[in-house]
Amino acid sequence: MGTFVLMELCKQSGVKNVIYQLLAPNITINIDEVEENRSYAVVIDKGIRYCLTGNPGIYDEEAPYVLLTDRTPTKQKLIDNDIRQRKWIKHPNQIEASPDDVINSWENRFHFKLEENEENPGLRRPQLGALHALLSHMLAPKEAATVVLPTGTGKTETMLSALVAGRCNRVLVTVPTNALRGQLFNKFKTLGVLKTPKFEIVDKEALYPIVGMITSAF
């Protein structure tokens, strides 16, 4: 069974200082059933039509997913991965979401799941303890709070959990190195493991956050 990975859908602006929002992650589709014509190919996977076209003006109107490629696609080119993806022409998640829309989408979408074993993953006890302490402090903050977590307990996922569960308007993260800045930027873009099918701590209906990365003075 052959597969092909469709590119993510995102909004991005800026060059050095970047603002980014992931609208939909990569999609892996089976390419066993492919309809071809002179301008485009339609992959049918689980009843959903994915159209890949080399011409932005010619594509399958019935397909909810339409992706522009650098050349006319064929099944063999998809199998060989001999095709370059350019941009989404049509996607169900192509929406304009304001920061308020994002925050509102997080309401009642966070689950306080405790990790029991490898088959039932969730947040570790130190993470849940820190998260509850943070949320309690945020209800009536009179002064700054400091949360200390042991090495290896998952500080990043705790920050991401606080962002969504607390429906924070803004979170500022400072880091000591360029490498860590890029690493955390990528984590915040995707919400780490929180939205993955394995964890499902954050529901799939919740929108991804709008994330900025500052690398130079304004």
Which sequence ranges carry the predicted segments?
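ATP-dependent helicase/translocase motor core
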Residues: 2-148, 157-166, 186, 190, ...
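ATP-binding Walker
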Residues: 153-154
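Conserved RecA-like ASCE P-loop NTPase motor core of nucleic-acid helicases/translocases
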Residues: 170-177
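Conserved helix-turn-beta segment of the N-terminal RecA-like "Helicase ATP-binding" lobe
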Residues: 179-215
